[in-house]
Amino acid sequence: MIKSELVQRIAEHNPHLYQRDVENIVNAILDEIVDALARGDRVELRGFGAFSVKHRPARAGRNPRTGAHVPVDQKSVPFFKTGKEMRERLNRETGDTDTGA
């Protein structure tokens, strides 16, 4: 599912809202999550999961084409950990008994 499909589904379930208003709300939520992560904050949506930032240290990499060693700078990457309710629901729907915890 892409963002436009999400907006459309939410608008269909909420006929009292205009689709452009739903799109503005979805964009505002995503912007707030990104802003919080950029500040170094953790964003927890109870039952859904938590977004955080992991910091990867600089390391030596390798160019796969030439085999030459190249330095890879440190970087921050987004990380998402699923919430318990989401894991349980996904496992119930797929029949998987391993909760991944």
UniProtKB/Swiss-Prot annotation:
Q: Which PROSITE patterns match?
A: HISTONE_LIKE (PS00045)
Region feature (Disordered): 57-77
What Gene3D superfamilies does this protein map onto?
A: IHF-like DNA-binding proteins
What's one Pfam family here? Answer: Bac_DNA_binding
Keyword Cell inner membrane found: no
Can you tell which superkingdom this protein's organism belongs to? Bacteria
Citing just one GO molecular function, the answer is: structural constituent of chromatin
Does the keyword DNA-binding feature in the UniProt annotation?
yes
Mind telling me which InterPro entries this protein's record contains?
Hist_DNA-bd (IPR000119), Histone-like_DNA-bd_CS (IPR020816), IHF-like_DNA-bd_dom_sf (IPR010992), IHF_beta (IPR005685)
Q: Which GO terms describe its cellular component?
A: chromosome; cytosol
Q: Name one GO biological process term.
A: DNA recombination
Q: Which keywords, in A-to-Z order, does the entry hold?
A: DNA recombination, DNA-binding, Transcription, Transcription regulation, Translation regulation
Q: Where is the signal peptide?
A: none
Spell out the family assignment given in the record's similarity comment.
Belongs to the bacterial histone-like protein family.
The record describes its quaternary structure and partners as: Heterodimer of an alpha and a beta chain.
Q: What does this protein do?
A: This protein is one of the two subunits of integration host factor, a specific DNA-binding protein that functions in genetic recombination as well as in transcriptional and translational control.
* Family annotation (PANTHER family): DNA-BINDING PROTEIN HU (PTHR33175), INTEGRATION HOST FACTOR SUBUNIT BETA (PTHR33175:SF5)
* Protein's recorded name: Integration host factor subunit beta
Species in which this protein is naturally found? Rhodopseudomonas palustris (strain HaA2)
Gene name in the database record: ihfB
